Amino acid sequence: MYCILVAGMPASGKSTIAVRISESLGIPMLSKDSIKEVLFDDLGFHSRAEKVQLGTAAMHILYYAAAQLMKAGKPFILENNFEDASIPGIMALLETHHYTAVTVRLTGDPEVIYRRFAARDLSDTRHRGHVVNDCYPEPPGAPQENPTRKSYEQFLDDNAARGYTRFQANGPVLEVDVTDLSELDFPRLMGSLTGFCTEGSSWISSATAHTKCIIPDRK
């Protein structure tokens, strides 16, 4: 059985792509950030350390839910900032339940993605729990905390150190250029995914399981 991991650097469009894949394939999608938002709203936090604990709890919940789907033999999608540190946990889950993961790894022009990253926390649609670090919910009447923005160099260094753009699991990688999401050739992406994910396909046990496929922008 298969699952799909949607990975990539922050603000690359993982949630948007994961939702579209989920709707196209008719399979469930689990998002760590969505779980974190529920924990932010239900439990809140009063320090950076407490916020980090909620992030850790969200990861445990994500993997628990994935394990239940695996026990039922269901295909599904996980969306997360997968990084080098994620590999032991996800690989253990895949091996325990005999699943193979297709990694959809989002990439593109880092300057463009950085601009999306810098603008995201200023958006009214961004959950404030992701933005603030000291306290959430924010006390009534308190001045709104502004995000401490990483420089472009810090953004690049963090991506390189954490391995967002090199993550892969135990199956093939579809590397997708998301520099301009409006120009993404989504039907081509879905054609590639459908071919990989057809039950019984030979890629699961083939020697080409780690071949990188480039899905470029539609021109």
Which stretches of residues belong to each language-model region?
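Loop/turn-to-beta-strand initiation segments
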Residues: 73-76, 100-102
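The conserved Walker
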Residues: 10
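Small-molecule kinase domains that catalyze NTP-dependent phosphoryl transfer to phosphate-bearing small molecules
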Residues: 123-184, 204-216
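Hydrophobic anchor at the beta1->P-loop junction of P-loop NTPases
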Residues: 6
